């Protein structure tokens, strides 16, 4: 090897050797500054589901919630329920202790509104349409809540430290009466997870 080529290669190999000695995450320019903390994902879970169980533990419905753009889309599908109309709501706590499911907390209401789409001072973000169940014991709805999401950077996030749940009530929601639309007892509940 010529002397000229050796003078060109030696500094390059020296730099490579020094770089190989550094461990991942070392900051050669300022080893005393640990830098900013690692970024935390703000996207959150793409979709959460819940099996809504009655006080005997039987699954009566399945709920799915997902963030779509700047909205929260909720779908509820019932199976094995008596025909009729039932109020359904998102609740603030991810806990469903039978028999009354009061551990699910109040309706999700991050904007501090009154209850119901027909209430001039309403509505809660957690207000959902009535679940209409046919003679075959099945029913479903899909509903989109604007300016809301599961988690992340959206202003109205459903999921916080204590989670959230979906509750079905014994009677239809009148979409007006505060706080729960005269929808009666909580008959099925599921934790979103």
Where are these regions (language model features)?
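Intrinsic disorder/low-complexity segments
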Residues: 10-11, 38
């Amino acid at each position: 090897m010529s002397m000229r080529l050796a003078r060109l290669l030696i500094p390059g190999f020296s730099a490579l050797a020094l770089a190989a000695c550094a461990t991942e995450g070392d900051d050669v320019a300022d080893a005393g500054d640990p830098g900013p903390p690692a970024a935390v994902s703000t996207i959150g879970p793409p979709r959460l589901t819940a099996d809504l169980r009655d006080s005997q533990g039987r699954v009566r419905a399945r709920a799915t919630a997902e963030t779509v753009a700047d909205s929260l889309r909720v779908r509820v599908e019932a199976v094995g329920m008596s025909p009729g109309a039932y109020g359904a709501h998102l609740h603030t706590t991810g806990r469903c202790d039978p028999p009354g499911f009061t551990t699910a907390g109040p309706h999700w209401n991050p904007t501090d509104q009154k209850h119901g789409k027909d209430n001039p001072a309403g509505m809660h973000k957690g207000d959902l349409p009535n679940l209409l169940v046919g003679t075959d014991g099945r029913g479903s709805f899909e509903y989109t809540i604007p300016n809301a999401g599961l988690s992340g950077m959206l202003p109205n996030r459903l999921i916080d430290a204590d989670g959230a749940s979906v509750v079905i009530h014994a009677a239809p929601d009148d979409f007006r009466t505060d706080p729960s639309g005269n929808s009666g007892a909580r008959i099925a509940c599921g934790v979103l997870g």
